Amino acid sequence: MNSGKFRADGPNDAYVSLLNPDGSVHTPKWIGATRDGLELNDPLGSAISGGKLYTVDIDYLRIFDLSSGKPLSSIKVDGATGMNGIGISSDGTVYASNTRNPEVVFKINPDGSSAVFSDHESLSLPNGVAIDNDGNIVVVNMGDNKVITFDQNGNIKKTEYAAESGGDGIVIMEDGTKYVTSVRHGSVSKFSNDGDVSVIARGIPNAASMCYDSIQNQLVIPMNSNYAMGFIQL
């Protein structure tokens, strides 16, 4: 996801790049080379589900066809001011964090309706969102080091703590292991199933949202300040 110019200077100029597994650029503007039917301003978190690419764009959820990049739909989320992280449940429900003013998590249903999923006081600059293997919604705080697991009704099931604060991205593996980036400390915390939490990587400038490449068995981490991507073999 590339935001392009600031919205005030050049709205609707964001684009999506396609990368090879080694980090080389396959297509600089896979989405965004043309603007035919495209509206994309400042996209942040993204996720793939059901042959579709989802991204949050300020107060909209944008959905694209994964094979062609064609825009499919844009859903306005009332009350959103800057959505950031995104997770998609097995039934197509989208959960998206709104990091500031307000600090909440939104729920966007498959029919396009939306509502606040949680505004719990434990949310402190909520950022990364993922769905665990039991269908729970896991949210990473950037304002502290909390990693909060909610059930589907919005109740807190448990709170874990990353090794360092400033959480951003989260990946949950099939075996339940979690990886969380710290955008403030440039590190990755590993949450083992035995309760151990440890830093497995450091020195990643502005380690932001991330994804897991299951073919190469690696974490892929945007380094915002470097306009680059980092790769960590697991």
Which residues are covered by each model-predicted region?
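Short loop/turn segments that connect beta-strands within beta-propeller blades
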Residues: 19-24, 65-70, 108-113, 150-155, ...
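A short beta-strand motif characteristic of beta-propeller blades
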Residues: 25-37, 70-76, 113-120, 155-161, ...
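Beta-rich, blade/repeat-based domains predominating
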Residues: 34-52, 78-96, 100-102, 120-136, ...
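Flexible, glycine-rich linker and terminal segments associated
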Residues: 223-226, 231-234
